[in-house]
Amino acid sequence: MIGKLKGIIDSYGEDYVILDVQGVGYQVHCASRTLQALPSPGEAATLSIETYVREDQIKLFGFRTDTEREWFRLLQTVQSVGAKVALAVLSTLPPHDLANAIALRDKAAVARTPGVGPKVAERIVTELKDKVPALSAVDPAVVKLSGAIDDNRAPRAVTDAISALVNLGYGQPQAAAAVATASRTAGEDAETAQLIKLGLKELSK
């Protein structure tokens, strides 16, 4: 099984890259975010690889990090989610944002993925909510905030700040994560305006 490839970028296709490794061109399918982050043809690149072997074909999937590859595997443990859908999800949400979306039970964020309807998004959030911490990609502050929101215990300033950031165009997971960090910095008595200001600062990093 191929676990990693290091070579020279030969060319790009719609959803794949041809990686030249010592004269052999490997066609590696990647999420759009991964393809966008790779260098120009002629430059060196390294990809973590997931190898799929079928009766009629061998298919390679490439990732910039091992964490991204682990998410690819984890997503496919969900009913109705195959390799194509898993790549689409990772094209829409990077691992950290996906982890936060699941922790916050934000089905809408996952459902923004092309080809993922409300039912599949709900399955992803429901079936993976207990597995997310194992990947250590989710912010503990977001998990705590998620529980507070679910139990209607979150301060009004926190929920108002999240709504304000969402209205500014940020996704729910990003907004919640930023406000969670802001709340941890400013303290439990922070006002909405302060949380928004600190949240925007966090989002600009």
Swiss-Prot record:
Alphabetical GO CC annotations of the entry are: cytoplasm; Holliday junction helicase complex; Holliday junction resolvase complex
Q: What are the boundaries of the region Domain I?
A: 1-64
Note down the stretches annotated as region Flexible linker: 144-154
Q: Principal place where this protein is found?
A: cytoplasm
Keywords attached to this Swiss-Prot or TrEMBL record, sorted alphabetically, are: Cytoplasm, DNA damage, DNA recombination, DNA repair, DNA-binding
**Region of interest: Domain II:** 65-143
Q: What job does the chain carry out?
A: The RuvA-RuvB-RuvC complex processes Holliday junction (HJ) DNA during genetic recombination and DNA repair, while the RuvA-RuvB complex plays an important role in the rescue of blocked DNA replication forks via replication fork reversal (RFR). RuvA specifically binds to HJ cruciform DNA, conferring on it an open structure. The RuvB hexamer acts as an ATP-dependent pump, pulling dsDNA into and through the RuvAB complex. HJ branch migration allows RuvC to scan DNA until it finds its consensus sequence, where it cleaves and resolves the cruciform DNA.
Q: Would you identify the family this protein belongs to, as annotated?
A: Belongs to the RuvA family.
UniProt-recorded name of the protein: Holliday junction branch migration complex subunit RuvA
Q: What organism does the record attribute this protein to?
A: Rhodopseudomonas palustris (strain TIE-1)
Ranked from the top, the taxonomy reads: Bacteria, Pseudomonadati, Pseudomonadota, Alphaproteobacteria, Hyphomicrobiales
User: Which gene does this sequence derive from?
Assistant: ruvA
